[in-house]
A protein has these predicted regions:
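C-terminal active-site "lid" helix and adjoining low-complexity regulatory extension at the edge
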Residues: 75, 89-90, 102-146
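Phosphate-binding site of ATP-dependent enzymes
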Residues: 2-87
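Active-site lining segments that contact anionic ligands and/or coordinate catalytic metals
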Residues: 36-38, 95, 107
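A short glycine-rich, hydrophobically flanked beta-strand micro-motif that places a catalytic Asp/Glu
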Residues: 26-27, 93-104
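Gly/Ser/Thr-rich helix-start
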Residues: 47, 98, 127
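Protein kinase-like catalytic core scaffold
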Residues: 24, 49-50, 96, 108-111
């Protein structure tokens, strides 16, 4: 890969690093579906509540719902559930949205979001994740007398 980088790209990257001090690089993962979409899996208290596809608008590659993506139901599979729950545990999240991509090698976690919107899963599946969050909070309240 480094051999395919142009000298002008290296110069540009150096300028960006000098100006900003930090650069995050991310491996490109080709979508197995051929269409620009990802999966948002909602995990509460170690359990997968449900998952949606976030489909990019026509002609776009960004599938974020706030940027015009459209939520559709995503079937729960053992692989999806296992990876989403393990990803949530890896960062110590009680409630999160785990973003995954379908690649030729299977599912890949790309992000664990600690403040995901529940609108997409509600719109696509009718699941209100706030109920599961409230149940978790209530079951973990300290019931000692003051």
């Amino acid at each position: 890969l480094l051999n395919s980088i142009e000298q002008s790209d290296i110069v540009s990257l150096r300028r960006i690093i000098e100006a900003n001090g930090l650069v995050y690089l991310q491996e490109f993962i080709a979508a197995a579906s051929g269409s620009p979409r990802d999966i948002r899996a909602f995990v509460v208290d170690g359990r997968l509540q449900g998952a949606i596809y976030r489909n990019a608008p026509p002609g776009e590659w960004i599938s974020n719902l706030a940027r015009g993506g459209r939520p559709t139901p995503c079937p729960k599979t053992r692989e999806l559930e296992d990876l989403a729950v393990r990803s949530a545990r890896a960062v110590g999240a009680i409630y999160c949205g785990v973003d995954l991509l379908e690649s030729k090698d299977g599912l890949t976690t790309i992000e664990v979001n600690g403040t995901p919107s529940g609108k997409g899963i509600y719109d696509a599946l009718g699941i209100d994740v706030t109920e599961a969050i409230a149940e978790h909070v209530c079951s973990n309240l300290d019931h000692r007398k003051a």
